[in-house]
Amino acid sequence: MPGFSRRPLAVFVCCLFAGVQTGHAAADIERAMVQGESTAPAAERSVAMQLAAVSELPLNLRKERKFDVLGKKKQPAEPVAPMLAPEKPIELKKDDAYPLFIVADQIEGQADELTEAEGDVELRKVGTLIYADRLTYRPLEDEVEATGSVRMLQDGAEISGPHMRMKLADQIGSAEQVTYHIVKEVPSRFYAPQQTVVTVASSNATNSGAPMMLNVSNSYGLPTQLPPPRPSEANGYAERVEFEGENQMTLFSNTYSTCKPGQADWYMKSSETHLDYDRSEGTARNATLWFGGVPIVYTPVAGFPLSTQRRSGILHPHFSASTRSGLDISVPYYLNLAPNYDLTLVPRYMSKRGMQLGADARYVDYFYEGEARFEYLPNDEMLGRSRYGYRFEHRHNLGQGVSAALNWNGVSDDLYWQDLSSRLLQTSQAQLPRQVSLGYSPSPWLQSNLQVLRYQTLQIDPNNPVTRPYFLEPQLNLVGYKPNIWKTDFSMVGQFSRFTHVDAGKVQGDRMVFYPQLSLPIVHPAFQITPKIGLHMTKYTLDQQAAGLPESISRVLPTFSLDSTVILEREGDWFGRGYIQTLEPRLYYVNIPYKDQSQIPLFDSGLSDFNFAQIFSENRYSGYDRINDANQLTAALTTRLLDGETGVERLKAMVGQRYYFKPQRVAITGETTRQNDFSNLVAAVNGLVAPKTYADVAWEYNYRENISERFSAGVRFQPELGKVMSASYRYTRDPLTTLSTVDQVDIAGQWPISANWYAVGRYNYSLRDKRVLESIAGVEYNAGCWAVRLVGQHLGAISGAANDTVFFQLELNDFGSIGSNPIGLLRRSIPGYGKINELPTSSSLLTSQ
């Protein structure tokens, strides 16, 4: 059969149809082929461009042949009515015929047997694009052999070399003397939402807590949203490549790096590397890691990730040094046992204390989830005894409205967290809960819960002993809320509690509470009025009561409240944007008669903090052991700035005060009864005070004595991820001693100091104690495909010597890291901290507020 090159008319028509060498059409078709899109629309759009170019430029006639790969004959298209968009996407099945095009200066061969192309050859198929000097295609085997300057683009990979052979449909073949460049999109694991367990400075805080504004809603315009997936690159050279199917290849005598081509600051050199993109993992044999032209690590077998997906294997070792533990080395081993459960084993060596073993197991299912963590040090060489810590959490949906939960924590001794810097809890809490609960919700308006709750109390500071709380063994709660009952809302609380204590001499006993309430909401677009009545009933059955005190006590108190709010609005302008300002005066009246409660023990009640949440509550005490007598009115004023386009709140300011119409009679131990007819003034402001600047201020002012009882102020400026500065001040005064219990300044930030260099730090100082609670200082360098971090931490101890730690980490992007990882520390200590080698590059990610 004659060769196709002898049919000039067909060749000319094919050239017009292909049109891949003219203008922007060539780039459009190449992008479409690499991304797996159909090239037909692009080719059709380019015809007019090509015809216009013919009159101005000499037309270089080239040959093109089209194949139906699976041998199916192309059916003539039926006329179809024009549509704006298809009702659903067209799906290509595995046995459908994928069209294949070959374009070259010369094409010869036999139909359906052999085609040979030479001279600037281009093969196009959905998802695949091959360039070569010479190419042979066998349609029956669907096999291509290309020689010369071969370049293949397929599924985000670019493979170049002098020779390649491949079966296109199966993606099986080989190539020699290859340079490769692979680009995949991966999501950021660092910026993904996660729960952060933190502490704040309490009334007797002498240690460093979490900084203010650690978690700020992205509605305020700060760049806190999750960035889109970022490109992950891999490139290198291989003497030979075996293509082993879709997303599978093996490189021989190769290099591997995630740096850009020609800028390999680091690379791995190995005798064999297998890349499995289905499992998102790579495996190298006889591998040597080179950095800056110097070999730094050799391993006979190395596994590394190809994405952020989980995989089994040795995680990157962590190294650090501290004054309490000495040289600290841990080598975690991760077991991806199943998609819904995993296990991490963490052997840890501390030069001053010995060998510790840790384990972390996680699991999740449709109806339950949980996590178990355990650490064991068989022999602490500094103390001469074993030490351990554990934490177990489980939540279970048993169906039919039944749920269960377990939260069990424990350590071997009081100073376990302080000495071993454990990662079990990112907090220095002194009360470790041990709780088992069972919940039941028979209907949407009724919930019940049964729990047993105990605590392990840690006495960390001998100068400030921690009071041991009562245990609940057990407690039964019943909560109900039924709206719209003849235009009224019904709510009720029922509770039975059995209080026990480790100190057998303390009073113990049972408490029963039943508190039904009925309210009548009157709602209008401009105002709301809600009167509410209730009857608070409590009964105690006590053990170990002091002589002369009753063992059975009952208390019945009626309650009445009236809550009213008016909402006024106006439009305006703020920082060049339209906004809506609201003005919301609110009055809240409460009346509860007096009843002597001095014979009732204090199981779980205490004086609540005086703030905006508390001044709009009926009872100033927590728990149910004390119900205050009240004839009082709270007056407050709130103003908000709402975005004129979205309605999102940008700024809120509040001020309020409570007025008393009779003297206080109910009090708890240590409380000074009120002598005035009005409370302290409380005020708060939070929100966007300037572009990219968030502020949070709270103030309790005693204007009778002209002093501040409580004050906190913080500001966070963050124009973009990787640039953030924050500063805060916290002060709390003890009303009994008139001395400050908290008086701290806290400054933290991350900021670029030169090209690719970032400074990080935190300074938390106690003005009351005149000592540094925590200081962090360090630098980070982002080289594009690798980053290095050097961070020092000074952590003041509640008792004993302070702990100083140095972190050094070399991170190779999308490959691994060497050294001690300070990321967790920086994230907990610096509000808005951004990982410098995962920062988004598009300014469109940042909001304009």
From Swiss-Prot:
One of its GO terms (cellular component) is cell outer membrane. Belongs to the LptD family. It is found in: Cell outer membrane. Its main location: membrane. This is LPS-assembly protein LptD. It holds the Pfam family LptD. Together with LptE, is involved in the assembly of lipopolysaccharide (LPS) at the surface of the outer membrane. Keywords: Cell outer membrane, Membrane, Signal. Residues 1-25 form the signal peptide.
